[in-house]
């Protein structure tokens, strides 16, 4: 028993206790050490995983509002199952990006396989950590496709928030078993009973089924593991069938190419076997297989029901299509597994190097980041004012912020980002116009400079979202005022409790991409939460607003606005330009034009030399002659001069 205690509890002490065992024979010591090494090796032995039957596998995810303790709970579950050692430094173990640790959010979905003994049986629990923010809902959707149930985590202090509602409906739509859990019950202001009642009011969840835990100190976390085993069903997987697997995430490794995170639906796969992509038809040889615990542990095979990492020498991330089905090459046909609807970018922004000499470096940095984020779209763009750059498409504002921050942190790049815009759908009219656009009756435009004139268009459509706002009741008036100002239409209103109300609005995406969230937080003193989901395109009265400087069109300053806001937006923009453009030798007329009509104008006065300063009396005709000569000179200069608008002016107008 002494040797067993030393080996299992503190293996590092073996060399220190050898003198205590010197009386044993060499054969006994060798036999004991051999037994020890076999036991230690068994933790990495792949047979421990692939010999666990499908009935004892649980694939689950944790979904929650931002900062409700999702990553902290994941840390505790990893510790309780012995996947990682218990230590004070275990914070956001599954969050590997620097931006994730700084912002306290999850951006990329991560996975960890946990071995959990329960009632004399060994269970394999595959934890798939998901992002919490709406912008990364595609990551959530990918993760849930490999799950059979979810833990719905709610802060017992803050209660149900907007993204809690969105995540609940996402899980319900996929018909997943939901285990409700209240976190942070150790806080002084925690109100678990009231929050449990909120869950019943909004989702009809029985308060008696709600678990109460503190992920920070570990209270009640073991009960979560037990309920995962009890409530969640095993995956619908068949090991006797031929191999099929679903790719639900991927990332790029500079040495191994695209690595695929897969859920094995049927059969098994071994290293050296050949597989085929159902989407592209390309064949690959499996180079590596691994379980994530949460670091990679190489295995020889993955079997149905398991989640693991598959490397097959895909050269680019474009070969790895999220939602694609992989199948064995020996099979002649492929029945694809239900995949995902590809996410379309909702917000676009121009990205330009601050110095054009940095263009190649910034291009390389963007290409490397896009390898790991397939949701970003990239197209070349150029501007006379800002030079060569790119127009990038993002899922939302946080997605844009995170991408920009990763450019700065990981590649030390500090680009110019223009104000975000959205994509408009346009229905063209006239056979010639449709033919000029490749025969497409409908086109999508994200660059305002390319927005077609009304004479070419039958109908304009702009993207709308269904927004959910949860806020204190006393803030209802100001919030309604803000939403009405942003052209929002109220759909529903529900009192969660005596102090908070949940309202849903149909609102244009263009009205919320800039500062809506900041304004909402300001008028609610930070207590309101906001979430939105895509609602498709809605017909809208849109106009293109051009900016003219002394009659010359400036493409970089073109914007698309709703006709009801054209006048007010035009006044704001021309006034801002008047303040930013430096005075010059000629007078500058700053005009905002909509449909050929000037809707706002400001005049920037020219520098003027006092040509009469040398006069000291005498005939007034001399004075008039000098002033006339000056006026004619200014007129001639205005006709031939180019207006010099500094680059900084464009940056200040266009930047976020």
From Swiss-Prot:
Protein location: Mitochondrion inner membrane
Protein origin, superkingdom: Eukaryota
Coiled coil location: none
Residue ranges constituting the tr-type G domain according to the UniProt record: 55-236
Main localization category: mitochondrion
A GO CC term assigned to this protein in UniProt: mitochondrial matrix
Keyword RNA-binding: no
Gene Ontology terms describing biological process: positive regulation of translation
EC number from the UniProt entry: 3.6.5.-
Entry-linked CDD domains: EF4_II, EF4_III, LepA, lepA_C
GO molecular function list: GTP binding; GTPase activity; mitochondrial ribosome binding
The UniProt record lists the keyword Membrane: yes
Entry membrane topology: Peripheral membrane protein
Database matches in InterPro entries: EF-4, EFG_III/V, EFG_V-like, G_TR_CS, LepA_C_sf, LepA_CTD, LepA_IV, P-loop_NTPase
Keyword annotations: GTP-binding, Hydrolase, Membrane, Mitochondrion, Mitochondrion inner membrane, Nucleotide-binding, Transit peptide
Residues where GTP binds: 64-71, 129-133, 183-186
Catalysed conversion reaction: GTP + H2O = GDP + phosphate + H(+)
Pfam family, one: EFG_C
First-tier enzyme category under EC: hydrolase
Function: Promotes mitochondrial protein synthesis. May act as a fidelity factor of the translation reaction, by catalyzing a one-codon backward translocation of tRNAs on improperly translocated ribosomes. Binds to mitochondrial ribosomes in a GTP-dependent manner.
PANTHER family given in the database record: TRANSLATION FACTOR GUF1, MITOCHONDRIAL, TRANSLATION FACTOR GUF1-RELATED
Misc remark: This protein may be expected to contain an N-terminal transit peptide but none has been predicted.
Protein family membership: Belongs to the TRAFAC class translation factor GTPase superfamily. Classic translation factor GTPase family. LepA subfamily.
NCBIfam families linked: lepA, small_GTP
Protein name: Translation factor GUF1 homolog, mitochondrial
């Amino acid at each position: 028993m002494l040797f067993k205690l030393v080996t299992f509890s503190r293996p590092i002490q073996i060399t220190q206790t050898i003198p205590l065992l010197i009386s044993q024979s060499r054969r006994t010591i060798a036999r004991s050490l051999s037994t020890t090494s076999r036991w230690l090796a068994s933790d990495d032995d792949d047979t421990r995983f692939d010999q666990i039957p499908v009935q004892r596998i649980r694939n689950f995810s944790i979904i929650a509002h931002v900062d409700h303790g999702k990553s902290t709970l994941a840390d505790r579950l990893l510790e309780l199952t012995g996947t990682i050692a218990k230590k004070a430094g275990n914070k956001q173990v599954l969050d590997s990006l620097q931006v994730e640790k700084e912002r306290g959010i999850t951006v990329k979905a991560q996975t960890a396989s946990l071995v959990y003994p329960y009632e004399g049986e060994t269970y394999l629990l595959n934890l798939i950590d998901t992002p919490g923010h709406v912008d990364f809902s595609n990551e959530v959707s990918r993760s849930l496709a490999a799950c059979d149930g979810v833990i719905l985590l709610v802060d017992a202090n803050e209660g149900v928030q907007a993204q809690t509602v969105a995540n609940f409906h996402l899980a319900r739509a996929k018909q997943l078993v939901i285990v409700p859990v209240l976190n942070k019950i150790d806080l002084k202001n925690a109100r678990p009973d009231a929050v449990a009642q909120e869950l019943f009011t909004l989702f009809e969840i029985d308060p008696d089924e709600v678990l109460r835990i503190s992920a920070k100190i570990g209270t009640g976390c073991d009960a979560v593991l037990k309920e995962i085993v009890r409530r969640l069903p095993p995956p619908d997987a068949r090991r006797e069938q031929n191999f099929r697997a679903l790719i639900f995430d991927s990332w790029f490794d500079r040495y191994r190419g695209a690595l695929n995170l897969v859920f094995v639906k049927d059969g098994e796969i071994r290293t050296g076997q050949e597989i085929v992509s159902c989407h592209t038809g390309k064949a690959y040889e499996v180079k590596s297989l691994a379980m994530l615990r949460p670091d990679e542990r190489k295995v020889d095979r993955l079997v149905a029901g398991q989640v693991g990492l598959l490397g097959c020498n895909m050269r680019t991330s474009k070969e790895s299509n999220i939602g694609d089905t992989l199948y064995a090459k020996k099979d002649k046909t492929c029945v694809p597994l239900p995949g995902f609807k590809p996410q379309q970018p909702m917000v676009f922004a121009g990205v330009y190097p601050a110095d054009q000499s940095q263009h190649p470096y910034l291009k390389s940095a963007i290409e490397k980041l896009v390898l790991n984020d397939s949701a970003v779209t990239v197209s070349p763009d150029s501007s006379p004012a800002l030079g060569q750059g790119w127009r990038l498409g993002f899922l939302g504002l946080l997605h844009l912020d995170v991408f920009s921050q990763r450019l700065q942190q990981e590649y030390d790049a500090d680009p110019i980002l223009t104000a975000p815009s959205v994509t408009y759908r346009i229905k063209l009219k006239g056979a010639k116009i449709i033919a000029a656009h490749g025969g497409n009756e409908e086109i999508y435009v994200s660059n305002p400079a390319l927005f077609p004139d009304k004479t070419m268009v039958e109908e304009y459509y702009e993207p709308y979202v269904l927004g959910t706002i949860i806020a204190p009741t006393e803030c209802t008036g100001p919030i309604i005022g803000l939403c009405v100002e942003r052209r929002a239409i109220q759909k529903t209103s529900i009192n969660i409790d005596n102090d908070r109300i949940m309202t849903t609005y149909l609102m244009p995406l263009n009205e919320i991409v800039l500062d809506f969230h900041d304004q909402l937080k300001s008028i609610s003193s930070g207590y309101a939460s906001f979430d939105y989901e895509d609602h498709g395109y809605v017909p809208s009265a849109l106009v293109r607003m051009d900016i003219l400087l002394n009659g010359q069109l400036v493409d970089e300053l073109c914007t698309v606005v709703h006709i009801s806001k054209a006048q007010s937006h035009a006044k704001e923009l021309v006034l801002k330009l008047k303040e930013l453009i430096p005075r010059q030798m000629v007078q500058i007329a700053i005009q905002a034009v909509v449909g050929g009509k000037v809707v706002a104008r400001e005049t920037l006065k020219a520098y003027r030399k006092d040509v009469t300063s040398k006069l000291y009396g005498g005939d007034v005709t001399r004075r008039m002659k000098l002033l006339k000569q000056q006026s004619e000179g200014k007129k001639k200069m205005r006709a031939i001069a180019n207006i010099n608008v500094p680059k900084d002016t464009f940056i200040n107008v266009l930047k976020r």
